[in-house]
Amino acid sequence: MMESNEENREKKTIEDLPGVGEATAEKLRENGYDDIMAIAVASPKDLSDVTGIGEGAAAKIIAAARKFADIGNFETGEEILERRKSIQKLTTGSKNLDDLLGGGLETQAITEFFGEFGSGKTQIMHQLAVNCTLPKEKGGFDSDVMMIDTENTFRPERIIQMAKSKGADPDETLKRIHVARAYNSHHQILLAEKAQDTAKEYNIKLLIVDSLTAHFRSEYVGRGSLAERQQLLNKHMHDLLRFGTIYNAVIAVTNQVSARPDVFFGDPMAPIGGNIVGHTATFRIYLRKSKGGKRIARLIDSPYLPEGETVIQISEEGVSDGT
């Protein structure tokens, strides 16, 4: 049954959807909505904004796309379990951290790493980028990577170090990592929206955003702008999740923290983004510095895994369990 649905999706084009004429189809394609699945997981407002049609008409187009794609209906637990067999897991380079995450980072999910400056967030993103290009027998996907760099922290020299430690060709590894610098929050959102264009040309199985909240935090200051910030952040995260769902890709993001002034006992640090990030991220890892290059990684949120923590090592060779 699942195979026939997949074949049905491939045969249908967006022109087959009722209400999608030549002009509307062109506008949809220009904005990344060039297949049935992309439209099926969109919102009426998104389609209305890019095509100029009313939200009511957009809702009908989406409903038809969902029918073609066979999504949006109730499923049995058995059917969901069968569908989840398509999910793959990407190694972090540390068996300890992989075990904490139930085998690695899941595709079709957002995994958030948050912590203070120097806690290892960007190092882990570099390691994930290298690992994604590795063959499957080494825990990779043998696939390309996209990275949205918001703080100018991507370093090809670090990729070379990590690739060499994995026995991979550094030049070939660098060729498979596609980096875009985001200069503000709107540019960041646009890059995520356009990620599908790159995914059509390359086999992208990992999308990294480092850092998710830096631009939003600096541009939307004060309570007066909080609602707008959260609305944009919500849209951005759902764009990322949609990409992961459509391309069966891992979404890995980093996040900053701030101290809560109302906390007098325990750890006062909390991730930026509030409930929007908290509810949309599938897995949340809190990173803390320890001694001798070690980091403590704590899983604080997951749909099915228990809370727990482990120790990882970050060295010149990359992320590992250490000794």
Curated annotation (Swiss-Prot):
Per the UniProt entry, what is one GO biological process? DNA recombination
Q: Which GO terms describe its molecular function?
A: ATP binding; ATP hydrolysis activity; ATP-dependent DNA damage sensor activity; damaged DNA binding
What SMART domains does this protein map onto?
AAA, HhH1
Question: What Pfam families is this protein classified in?
Answer: HHH_5, Rad51
Which positions are annotated as binding ATP?
115-122
Which residue stretches does the UniProt record annotate as biased composition, category Basic and acidic residues?
1-15
Keywords of the record:
ATP-binding, DNA damage, DNA recombination, DNA-binding, Nucleotide-binding
What are the boundaries of the region Disordered? 1-21
- Record's family? Belongs to the eukaryotic RecA-like protein family.
What is the recorded function of this protein according to its Swiss-Prot or TrEMBL entry?
Answer: Involved in DNA repair and in homologous recombination. Binds and assemble on single-stranded DNA to form a nucleoprotein filament. Hydrolyzes ATP in a ssDNA-dependent manner and promotes DNA strand exchange between homologous DNA molecules.
Cross-referenced PANTHER family, in alphabetical order? MEIOTIC RECOMBINATION PROTEIN DMC1_LIM15 HOMOLOG, RECA/RAD51/RADA DNA STRAND-PAIRING FAMILY MEMBER
- The name this protein goes by in its record: DNA repair and recombination protein RadA
Species this protein is from: Thermoplasma acidophilum (strain ATCC 25905 / DSM 1728 / JCM 9062 / NBRC 15155 / AMRC-C165)
Q: Which gene encodes it?
A: radA
